Amino acid sequence: MEVPPQKSAPGSALSTARVLGGIQRPRHLSGFGFGSDGLLGSPERAASSSPVTTLTQTMYNLAGLGSETPKTQVGSLSFQNRLTDLSLSRRTSECSLSSESSESSDAGLCMDSPSPMDPQTAERTFEQAIQAASRVIQKMQFTIKASVFASEAAGHSPVLQNITNSQALDSWEKDEAGYRAASSPGEDKENDGYIFKMPQKLPHSSSARALAEWASRREAFTQRPSSAPDLMCLTTDGKMDVEEASPVAQSSSLTPVERACEEDDGFVDILESDLKDDDMVPAGMENLISAPLVKKLDKEEEQDLIMFSKCQRLFRSPSMPCSVIRPILKRLERPHDRDVPVLSKRRKSGTPLEEQQLEEPKARVFRSKSLCHEIESILDSDHRGLIGDYSKAFLLQTVDGKHQDLKYISPETMVALLTGKFSNIVEKFVIVDCRYPYEYEGGHIKNAVNLPLEPDAETFLLKHPITPCNLDKRIILIFHCEFSSERGPRMCRFIRERDRAANDYPSLYYPEMYILKGGYKEFFPQHPNFCEPQDYRPMNHAAFRDELRNFRLKTRSWAGERSTTQLCSRLQDQ
């Protein structure tokens, strides 16, 4: 049935000349040009174009008007894909309509027939479609903000971030598939107004409870330290500070009124459904993620670990605690699920823990120690202050001399000894004059014995040693020569060497011996009264050169014989 076309005034807002399906668009819409005589410009242009070309251009402009608005470009990528699918479906319908219009034009039908739809109804339907598209853009922006908030809350834990991303991707794919399934059944629905269907909103109390549960469950991930030292050193105050700074705590601290003020439009309920899916995570996996890295042992457990390897105890670090050392057996207890007697083996070594705990600690054996006070005092004391047998200290006052291993006395001490000041302690003293005979005859100290050669001194002192009648008194030997620099010290060392060889260590015949400092040359000028004759004859006297030569030869020959004899004795001992 054909309806006669309605003529519109030139200044009206709508033109019904060339509109498909009765949908009219207002003139005040931006981005779409209207002519003075219709939808696409002047009547001259409409007359020059064929009806099929005019219809194709009209449908193309109608499809582009709703798909490329500035607000649509701000929307998400998925929404653009949906609008692209709609435009493609519209273009498909345009092609089909163009083919039908060509057939109708061939049959003599006019495509400029008026639409049966009322112009006001068409304008209202068009405005509703535009408003629905703007609401879709706003809701998608809110969804993007919610996903960004969830990613920031899960930023402290990579595991939580992966779980949240995977769940969000699954839910988004499900929504996308449902939308495509709903929009695919028929192509005739493209002319209907696209109205965004709001999701069913659950009660507000359930969303608040879900947010609180989500915040408490994710608290373990956000507060988990990144390393074991941070975990051990983290205090209660530090944990409170981290909780206050976390975005999850800030979001959960909002009051119900503040949350009600925020227009969630049901998208928080989607997040609640994702949280319910997290309940399917096994308890063991949740413990692995949220449990502390280091386990603290109780005192009872530390006491139970008693059996350790001795080698590990010996070579372990001193700062390492004993509880860290591995036990001898890898498994302290036998498995209870094996009751077959064939599989059970007898332990080769080791005692039960109860018997080992009852054992008393063994007494440690220390190094033996001598309790002899005298020997300890002798060994601990300085040997240089004791006489040869280490039994007593030196009686006479000593002075520093040329040889540090020998004891020197001054001429004044010699005079005190000659005058008998030490008679109560000294039973007998012997003054050994080591000079040559012509020197001794020229002048010597009273009661001195001339022993120029070592064999003579050995025969006189060691073949028939002098022994004290009273054990509390001492026997003292005093050696000197012209200067007490060479012959006197050499004779003193010789007598000590022979005395050591003749007695068991540390016993000696003559443990106390001295050297007269300065010799006879220094003693005679100071105390000539204790010399007889009171004269001094030097060793290199011109009248006694031959005697000096002879005694030197004897001394050297005897020294050579002694060295040869000692060498032969050493060879025989080997």
Curated annotation (Swiss-Prot):
GO terms for molecular function: phosphoprotein phosphatase activity; protein kinase binding; protein tyrosine phosphatase activity. Residues 31-51, 90-110, 339-359 are annotated as: Disordered. InterPro entries: MPI_Phosphatase (IPR000751), Rhodanese-like_dom (IPR001763), Rhodanese-like_dom_sf (IPR036873). The modification Phosphoserine is found at residues 42, 166, 246, 319, 349, 370, 557. PROSITE patterns: RHODANESE_3. Stimulated by B-type cyclins. CDD domains: Cdc25. It is found in: Cytoplasm, Cytoskeleton, Microtubule organizing center, Centrosome; Cytoplasm, Cytoskeleton, Spindle pole. The active site is at 481. Its EC number is 3.1.3.48. Pfam families: M-inducer_phosp, Rhodanese. Residues 90-105 have a biased composition (Low complexity). Phosphorylated by BRSK1 in vitro. Phosphorylated by CHEK1, which inhibits the activity of this protein. Phosphorylation at Ser-349 by AURKA might locally participate in the control of the onset of mitosis. Phosphorylation by MELK at Ser-166 promotes localization to the centrosome and the spindle poles during mitosis. Phosphorylation at Ser-319 and Ser-370 by MAPK14 is required for binding to 14-3-3 proteins. Tyrosine protein phosphatase which functions as a dosage-dependent inducer of mitotic progression. Directly dephosphorylates CDK1 and stimulates its kinase activity. Required for G2/M phases of the cell cycle progression and abscission during cytokinesis in a ECT2-dependent manner. The three isoforms seem to have a different level of activity. Interacts with MAPK14 and 14-3-3 proteins. This is M-phase inducer phosphatase 2. The gene is Cdc25b.
